[in-house]
Structures are given as structure tokens and as C-alpha cells.
Amino acid sequence: QQGVDVLVINPVQTTSAQTIVDTVSPSGTPIVFINREPEESVLDSYKGKCCYVGADARQSGTYQGELILETETQGDINGDGKVTYIMCKGDPENIDAQYRTEYSIKALTDAGKAVECLYEYLDNWDQTTAQQDVANALAQYGEKIEVVFCNNDAMALGALQSIQQAGRTAVSYTHLTL
């Protein structure tokens, strides 16, 4: 009879991570969470037997903001002293989406930039949904939109399609500064 040496788990919702730990911990089986980072308290509750392996979404978000700062206008295309943006967000319960959203803007504000969010869209990692939402945003806000932030590449591709269809030019495809 074979047992389990370790569980490798890619949680759909990180809010379920504590339940997973509580269920598995009596057996003493180690747990490795991948792709979606559970709260630190979850990892601490099964110390030495539980870890996360994956990208640091805080760093990913910070990098997005830093890329904006590297452009000629630093995201302030109209020169009014404020970066206006829309945000295409992934799953609201996904900590990676939360961190990417927070830290992309934090990079701008930490650099002294004033920011204004025109709208946040819940696109759940979906290219088609992001494409529709960005098309709607461009119709509603037009030239006010200077930056489009997306929590993942699929949504960014959808956003880019709408930007191009609206006759706008993306200054950089890495972060969709318009």
C-alpha cells in the first residue's frame, strides 16, 4: 500500500487554503502551494510542512508600475500632472490579482506620481471580457485613459485589441501606455 509523500496544490481560490491545511495537517503530509500564494498565516499554521512556490505578485505589480515610469511621459501623456488609468483585474479573491493591482499603482505613487483610477473592471483573467471592457472604457473615457493595467497577459492581449480597434496606439506593449 502506497502513501502520499507530499501534496502539490494549485488552489483555485486561496481562501480555501486554510481548509486544505486543516484537513491535511493531522496526517503530517507536507503541502506545497503553487501559482496562487495563500496568506502568510496559512503557511505559518503548518510551519515547516507548508510552503508556497511561485512568482511574487507584489514584485510583478511593482514592475508594471516601474515600466510606466520608464516611458517618456511616465504615464502622464497629457501632461496634467496626473496618471489616469483603468485596471483590468483577475479573480477578486486571488491574492496575486490583489497584489498586482495594489503594487502597480503603489510604484507610481511611491515615485511621487498623482494617479486617478477611472474604472476597475473585473475580467477574471479572460481575454474576451477584457477586450469588451476596454472597448467600453475607451468609448466612455476616450483620451482621458492614459494607462491600461492588466493583471495578466490574456487580459492585456484583449485590451490591446480594443486599443488598436479604437485607432489608438499603444506606446509600449509591455504595459499598454496609450
Task: Specify the residue positions occupied by each region the protein language model found.
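Flexible loop/hinge segments that line or gate small-molecule binding clefts
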Residues: 20-59, 80-84
